[in-house]
Amino acid sequence: MARKKISLIGGGQIGGVLAQLSALRELGDVVLFDIVEGLPQGKTLDIAEASPVDNFDVALSGANDYADIKGSDIVIVTAGLPRKPGMSRDDLIATNAKIMQSVSEGIKQYAPNAFVIVISNPLDAMVTLCQKITGFPSNRVMGMAGVLDSARFAAFIAWELGVSVKDVNAMVLGGHGDTMVPIIRYANVNGVPVMELLERKYNNDKAKAKEVMAALVKRTQGAGGEVVGLLKTGSAFYSPASSAIAMAESILRDQKRLLPVCALLNGEFGVKGYYVGVPCILGSNGIEKIVEFSLDAEEQAMFDNSVAAVKELVDSMK
């Protein structure tokens, strides 16, 4: 049986880590595409030369021609300018929209049967543009945001409580921006509600527990900017790459994982015609199901606010 083929569009920081992770997990043969000659070839050669040490058997190649992504099973798009300190994700829209147009046309021509995972910012707008230009069905075009935002939320909870990140379950919905919605009610450590653990940590001081949780939520919403501010020359790349690989692996290996995915909604959660982060089951058919659940009044208000921000951003491209 032929190996799967994974094409990565954009040979920058995220693209390089994506190529390495794809190889380490042996998800399939890897093509790293970039417009800069030599860059993707050099990165993939470097990773391939580690194969005897890391024990992986996949072919890696660099490309400067979209024809090389032909026959891809999955395409992950990271192409675009990264954020710099003081910039919001939305500040990138004009420049990255032009890049996304050309990328989407290349995918449509050479990988018409591929699943597409978009990472480029501003995510909600870029994935919308990609789906519109490719014309692919919505189950095959999705954005990576919620997996990363949820991972950040879970990490902050684990560090606050002094527990293993492996035991923390946390979900973040909505747009990939400052209005994202961490769902506090369902956050738990191996089934024990996080709020209950926080209250116990602070001697049953409910006000203090709420204050701490509010700080964790705020840090989650600004987590990308926190990394940008520290790096000064770019944005996060390890955690976004890991998050996209989790999605790709669930599709390629038909794992049926329930993950927060930026998906095109058709009435779910009361939203129609926009890409928003919601829980989805990812399997061999891409987005196989959008999983709805009830939101309380506060969560619904935050979700509505997040959707409004997404609509404003996406509509600004029209």
From Swiss-Prot:
It is an enzyme of class 1 (oxidoreductase). Keywords: NAD, Oxidoreductase, Tricarboxylic acid cycle. It holds the Pfam family Ldh_1_N. Its EC number is 1.1.1.37. The keyword NAD applies. Substrate binds at R83, R89, N121, R152. Gene3D superfamilies: Lactate dehydrogenase/glycoside hydrolase, family 4, C-terminal, NAD(P)-binding Rossmann-like Domain. InterPro entries: L-lactate/malate_DH (IPR001557), Lactate/malate_DH_C (IPR022383), Lactate/malate_DH_N (IPR001236), Lactate_DH/Glyco_Ohase_4_C (IPR015955), Malate_DH_type3 (IPR011275), NAD(P)-bd_dom_sf (IPR036291). The active site is at H176. GO terms for molecular function: L-lactate dehydrogenase activity; L-malate dehydrogenase (NAD+) activity. Catalyzes the reversible oxidation of malate to oxaloacetate. Belongs to the LDH/MDH superfamily. MDH type 3 family. This is Malate dehydrogenase. The lineage of its organism: Bacteria, Pseudomonadati, Thermodesulfobacteriota, Desulfuromonadia, Geobacterales.
